[in-house]
A protein has these predicted regions:
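A short amphipathic helical element positioned immediately N-terminal to and/or at the very start
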Residues: 1-3, 73
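"Rare, low-scoring activations can occur
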Residues: 69, 149-150, 156-160, 179-264
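Short beta-strand boundary microenvironments
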Residues: 75, 79-170, 183-199, 216
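Short secondary-structure boundary/capping segments
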Residues: 2, 40-43, 142-144, 217-218
């Protein structure tokens, strides 16, 4: 009788132990997801908006490229009193499916596949990314060829990748595009760690600043994205409706119109 009870209780304890193990793994997984979700992104999207632009109309200036129109909109937007800073970029927004990749190598052997960020100087300030005040992205040199320019600014995640594999790696270490050791790529600074997505690891990006010349000559017909940060004291729940009614009509350039503006 005692043996039967022990056998019965043993099954109960085994079931309780199994439930404990399942609950432990479930709570641990949920805890990790919660930690990852609420861990700082490394940039700030409060008071940040993105323009949605369309082309249309029965007539247009054939001498103007897409680049001319995007730049016209950007320049008008930057003059708006409520706008703190604005930026134009190509395939480069965080939390976006638009991607452009290339591989940078050290000593032409140790390479890392990096997302290439092509953006104007205001990009890091729009998203309030961490950067060295003495070596800001906005002051970085510009070189032509958006796919293989000679100046980059690595994200901290990318720099850490190289540091783990190359003893003594620093901002002074020369790089090269993988398979092209003849052309040296110079590091111009570093952007503090951040994540592309809420559940992502530290991003491995390489930033390249583009100016009007690069935009007009190399990106003239490509589609761009424009984002901007509104001054905190001038942002409000009805800012979008005010923007579309009062500001958007003044930004339209040739046959490129502002269709919408959305919080990032």
């Amino acid at each position: 009788m005692i043996r039967a009870r022990l056998r019965s209780n043993g099954w109960v304890f085994a079931e309780l132990f199994l439930v404990f193990i399942v609950m432990w793994f479930l709570c641990d997984s949920l805890g990790c997801l919660k930690y990852t979700f609420y861990r700082p992104l490394g940039y700030n999207i409060d008071h940040v908006y993105q323009l949605s632009m369309i082309k249309g109309g029965e007539s247009w200036d054939s001498s103007m490229t897409n680049a001319d129109k995007y730049l016209g909109i950007l320049q008008k937007l930057e003059r708006e009193p409520a706008v703190e800073v604005a930026a134009l970029s190509y395939w480069s927004l965080p939390m976006s499916g638009n991607n452009s990749y290339n591989s940078l190598a050290v000593q032409d052997t140790i390479g890392c596949e990096l997302r290439i960020i092509n953006a104007t100087g205001g990009y890091t300030r729009v998203f309030r990314m961490k950067e060295d005040a003495k070596r800001p992205f906005a002051a970085m040199p510009v070189r032509g060829d958006v796919t293989s320019g000679n100046y980059v600014m690595l994200s901290e995640g990318a720099a850490d990748y190289y540091k783990e594999r190359v003893p003594g790696f620093s901002l002074d270490t020369p790089l090269s595009w993988y398979g092209d050791s003849a052309n040296v790529v110079i590091q111009c600074g570093m952007i503090g760690s951040f994540r592309s997505y809420r559940y992502g690891a530290d991003a491995e990006w390489a930033f390249r600043r583009i100016d009007e010349n690069v935009i007009r000559t190399e990106l003239r017909d490509d589609g761009a994205q424009i984002v901007f940060r509104v001054r905190e004291n001038m942002d409000s729940p009805d800012y979008r409706s005010k923007f579309l009614k009062e500001i958007a009509p003044h930004l339209d350039t040739d046959n490129m119109f502002i269709a919408d503006v959305v919080p990032y």
